[in-house]
């Protein structure tokens, strides 16, 4: 597994405003959207392309286009939905699948409650959208779900990550014969006793959409 922390002043600027507890939900959604687009630029450096011949107003030339099968973008519900538009801005022709996962706040274990994905993901590059890589349980379960269906290349885009979550991913994905890359805006200090990232930005889903009881 490879972890890439994006070092860019605009990324740091937007992340700082996301962290601020005074940032309201509409502003938080806009900043998250902008930040994901910046992260997506780094995350798609290995996106597969194929050659294509085109004719410019001056002469014929050879360029590239996204290879088939097209990439699959998979937001983890619900907070991952807040990252979808920012990702699709760079990959408008990608397919979108959905994976609903929930974390038990007592055991910190993740379980799947909904999915809308192709049955066969053989040969597919998958981009998983999960704003907070905290304990790592949700993302590990999502990656296993995708690889069980044949995905052969997975990149996860996270607004924030914690060292404990990355360590758990390394452990749970050990022996997995599929390249996995984590792209994040920051590696924070630690998790607290409730499994939240410190200093973090709070609950991403609540801050995106408001608290739903």
Curated annotation (Swiss-Prot):
Q: Does the keyword Coiled coil apply?
A: no
Q: Which GO terms describe its molecular function?
A: GTP binding; magnesium ion binding; uracil phosphoribosyltransferase activity
Q: In which pathway does it act?
A: Pyrimidine metabolism; UMP biosynthesis via salvage pathway; UMP from uracil: step 1/1
According to UniProt, the reaction catalysed is: UMP + diphosphate = 5-phospho-alpha-D-ribose 1-diphosphate + uracil
Q: How is its activity regulated?
A: Allosterically activated by GTP.
Q: Which cofactor does it need?
A: Mg(2+)
The Gene Ontology biological process terms listed for this entry are:
UMP salvage; uracil salvage
Identify the keywords attached in UniProt to this record, alphabetized.
Allosteric enzyme, Glycosyltransferase, GTP-binding, Magnesium, Nucleotide-binding, Transferase
The domain of life is: Bacteria
- Top EC group: transferase
- Tell me which EC number(s) this protein carries: 2.4.2.9
> Which annotated residues bind uracil?
197, 202-204
Q: InterPro entries per the record? A: PRibTrfase_dom (IPR000836), PRTase-like (IPR029057), Upp_B (IPR034332), UPRTase/APRTase (IPR050054), Ura_phspho_trans (IPR005765)
Q: How is the cofactor bound?
A: Binds 1 Mg(2+) ion per subunit. The magnesium is bound as Mg-PRPP.
Annotated residues for binding of 5-phospho-alpha-D-ribose 1-diphosphate: 78, 103, 130-138, 203
Q: What does this protein do?
A: Catalyzes the conversion of uracil and 5-phospho-alpha-D-ribose 1-diphosphate (PRPP) to UMP and diphosphate.
Listed HAMAP family: Upp_B
Q: Which family does it belong to?
A: Belongs to the UPRTase family.
Q: What is this protein called?
A: Uracil phosphoribosyltransferase
Question: What lineage is on file?
Answer: Bacteria, Bacillati, Actinomycetota, Actinomycetes, Propionibacteriales
Q: Which gene encodes it?
A: upp
